[in-house]
Amino acid sequence: MNFIITTRDFSNDDSVLRAAEMRDNVAGSISKAYKGTVRAEGKKKLLLKHLPVPPGGCSRRNSNLFVFCTERDYRKFHQGIAQLKRAPAELDPHEIQQVTASIRCRLQPSLREPPTPADELQTAVSRVCALFNQLVFTAQLRHYCEHQDKVVSYARDELTKRCGEKSALGVEVHQLVALLPHERHRELCHVLIGLLHQTPHMWARSIRLIGHLRHYLQNSFLHLLMNSGLDIAQVFDGCYHSEAYRMLFQIGHTDSVSAALELSHSAAAGPPEADENNDEGEEDDDELRHSDPAPLHDSKKPRNARRPRTRVPPHEQKPEENEEEEEELFPSCKATAAFLRAEPSVSNDDGNGGERCDTLATALRHRADEEDGPLASQTSVRVAATPSPSVTSALTPVTSPITPLCI
C-alpha cells in the first residue's frame, strides 16, 4: 500500500507573502506603464520624468559614464573603443566579449557568511553596477564604431540580449528592487525598472542620457549604502575612497567625510614625537622667527654654472619607457595599425611629397640593381624622382626676359 504524505502550512502569519505580493505589484505596475507606451521616445520621456535634474546640467560626452569606477578605468576602455574605430581590423567577436566581461565596478560584493541584509544589499548593488557598466560599453561600441560592420552587428545583438526584464541585468534589478522599501525609494525603483524597457536604439544614441543615469544611480546607491550602516573604507577599493568621500560631501554626509579627513591628516602627520624633541623644535622655531631674513638675490652675481649635457649618439639612445601608457585592449587592432603605418605611400599633395618620392626612388634603385643593371636603375630613379607639374611650378624661379639694348 502506498501512502502519500502531504504537508501544509497552517501558520496564520501571511506578512511575508503579503510583502512579496506588494513588491511584485509595484514592479508589475511600473512595467505595465512602460509596456503600454509603444514608441521608444515615449519610454525615454517616461524615464526622464522620474530622473531629477543634475546640479551641473547635462553631462559632457567625454565624461566618465561608468558607475563607481575611476577616471582611469573609464579611460582605459574608452581608448579601446577609439582603437577599434581607428584600425579597420578583422576582429573576432569573442575578443570583444572577453573585454566586455572584464568590466567591473569598484564596489566589492560582500563575502560574509551568513550574509546580513546590508551584505545582501551591497552584493546586489555591486552586480547591478557591473552589468550597467557592461551595457554602457556595448552602447558606446554601437555608437562610435558605426563604420565597422562586424562591430555594429555584434553590438546590436549584445544590446538586444542585455536589455529587457529577462536579461541578466533584469534579474539583478528585480532582486535589488525586492530588497528596497518601496515607500522610501519609489523613484529609484521606477528608474531601475525603466532601464529594462529602453530600446537598443536609445542606448546607442542617447549618450548624454546615460551620463544622467550614471549620476543619479551613483548618488542613490551611495545613499543606500550609507543608510544601511556600511563603511565606505570596507566596501570600496582603496583607489576609489577619495571619489566616494567627495560624493558623500556633495550629497550631505559631512560627518563621515570629516572623520575620514581627520584620519587622513593624522596618518600623513605620522606618530607624535617625544616632549624633548618638541621642546627643541620650539626653540628652533623661535630662533628662525627672530633671525634676520635672507638677503635678496643679486642679479649682478654670476649664476651657478649649469651642468653640461652629454650627447648620446643616435645608435646608443634607448627608447623612453612610458609608465602611464595604457595597455592595448585589442592586440589584433594594434598589429593592423602597425602594418598600416609601415606601408609605404606616395603623395605629392601634402608637404612631405619630396621625402616620400626619395623613399620610393631608393626602393626602385635597389630593385633595378637586382634585375636589369645600373642603366635601368638610373632610368627608374630619374622617373621616380621627377616631381609633379604642381611641384615643378612651385620650385621654378620666375625670371623676366632680358631685352638687349641698342646703342
Curated annotation (Swiss-Prot):
GO cellular component labels: host cell nucleus
Biased composition range(s): Basic and acidic residues: 287-301
Keywords for the protein's UniProt record, in alphabetical order: Host nucleus
Region Disordered: start-end pairs: 268-330
Signal peptide from the UniProt entry: none
Biased composition (Basic residues): 302-312
Amino acid composition bias (Acidic residues), ranges on this chain: 273-286
Annotated localization: Host nucleus
Disulfide bonds: none
Similarity comment: family membership: Belongs to the HHV-5 UL34 protein family.
Function, in words: Acts as a transcriptional repressor of the US3 gene expression through a specific DNA sequence named the transcriptional repressive element (tre).
Protein name (Swiss-Prot/TrEMBL): Transcriptional regulator UL34
Organism: Human cytomegalovirus (strain Merlin)
Organism classification: Viruses, Duplodnaviria, Heunggongvirae, Peploviricota, Herviviricetes
Name of the coding gene: UL34
